[in-house]
Amino acid sequence: VAALPPTLEWERELAAQGYTLVAGCDEVGRGALAGPVSVGVVVIDAATAAELPGVKDSKLLRGPVRQALVPAIQEWAQAYAVGHASAAEIDAVGLMAALRLAGTRALAAVSAELLPGYVILDGNHDWLSVPVQPEILFAGPAAGPAVEPAPGAAMMVRTRIKADMTCLSVAAASVLAKVERDAMMVELAQQFPQFGWDGNKGYATAGHRAAIAGHGATDFHRRTWRLT
């Protein structure tokens, strides 16, 4: 049985609660051995947005179909952005913090245009919210100057399992993130053709692992990961 296409049901529920500007958020590249982790954000007016035919979780779409949907998604959205965290950043701070870094970069970009009040995040773990630092949480009035909030700190974030398959704004974000990250890997493949990144996009195929074993890792590989 074919899966039902994503809808705006959840976004419209949020609009009814007063959250008009809703952002869908999804990541790609989490499991890759090379390249960035990338986070797409698509902001819509949940009270007035129409359904967008053809959009679904990026993993369910062929590459040319994803590419063809990008202009329609960009026109449909009130604002959109894709943020990235590099392989070196993943090695330096770990995957969850790198996801947060990429996500806050995307949110900062859309927030320069307008500030969403609510973020729907695919999955069951909120890696996007900025962790509260205890010294800030318990600081008294004499604790010194106020700390600048990180981008996105003022937004409500709600996780939803399989949101990329059920929430249209999240599915749209997944398409933008996938297309942009794929294009980055195809471009990098011109410098490093031996790894087949134009095909595997940095993921852990047998051929990719064999190429790493034969040629060694590049600066675009996640060196703290098991690569071979």
Regions from the PLM with identified roles:
Residues 1-228:
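RNase H-like, Mg2+-dependent phosphodiesterase core
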